[in-house]
Amino acid sequence: MNRRIFSSFIFLLLVGWAFAVSVTPAGNLPEYYAAVNNQSGKNLFDKVHTVAKVGYHSLGYDGLWSAYKQTDVRPDGTIWDMYSNCHFKLGSKQCGNYGSECDCYNREHSIPKSWFGKTTSGPGCDIFHLVPTDGKVNGMRSNYAFGEVSSASYTSGNGSKLGSSKTISVNGKTVAGDNISATCSGKVFEPIDEYKGDFARGYFGTMIRWAGDHQAFTSGNGGSIFSGNYTATGNFGLTKYGVALLLKWHREDPVSEKEIARNNGIQKTQGNRNPFIDYPYLVEYIWGEKAGEKVNLSNLISSSDSRFHPGESNGWIGDATDVEEVTFEPIVPTAVKVLRDGQLLIIQGEKVYNAQGCLINN
């Protein structure tokens, strides 16, 4: 073979291999996440961080508009806005000025950019937390932290609220301690229940992707949710309130078909994936009930697995010791009486008895 042709052949093989690694199909997720198996604590956090970066390339802030056409479209073909009931046509009514709901939509930093230096590069254009939302509602949300509202001062058309914070409680073990409760001081913004898990996993995924790149997200109101300390003693980047809130939302609103489709769309545009949409139960190994334990991927199912039921499954299947033993009672066949050649017989299943109850055929 000609040396130049051979070199070109090898180059194409390497390019194809690199492309296959960075654009792993959703059906091959166990292999994609193999590096996190048997990891725990800080090692697990770091491995997930590494996987979350695979294939990433910046869309740029302006590139988000066109990316939304592949990531945030409702079945009716309009923009999927999680803050309002507005249905914006693709490519039209991009903000712009607004005075009321449904005037236009913009690019919402669900992790406000004022929390990390007001940049529109790096995390400032990461589509996993930048979602299309109504301009008016986005403006009302401002840079307030997420939370649950006890008394609303503003409510959007779809029920998203701004107001004073409730106390958030989580029972059981977490990385922040057992049976934790915390409150955010000042106003908080609360999306509707249908999307709380989406935002929680967006926070988990965005934070862990940028954690090793000097992004703390702790400026201003960000300090109520993010600790900036990516060790176990720092709750792996979250405050006690952040752990309580995001765990609660993650558990109460499981991964939906919408999120799965968005995750796949983001890989096609931005190149990377959100580990906590692919394997939702990984959250428990870092911040929740399995904190400190080693991951066993054979106990988990991904959101692409046929056994995973969107909107219901948490991604845990456990092992044989978790399977409840079931005892089956034998089913006794019904006995029938028949008259055969002038003789009364009793037939039960395949057994035949005479009138005196003696087995005459087995």
Describe the residue ranges of each PLM region:
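N-terminal module-boundary/linker segments of secreted carbohydrate-active enzymes
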Residues: 21-88, 285, 292-295, 302-305, ...
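Sec-dependent N-terminal signal peptides
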Residues: 5-14
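N-terminal signal peptide c-region/cleavage motif recognized by signal peptidases
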Residues: 15-20
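Domain-level detector of nuclease and nuclease-like folds
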Residues: 97-106, 111-318
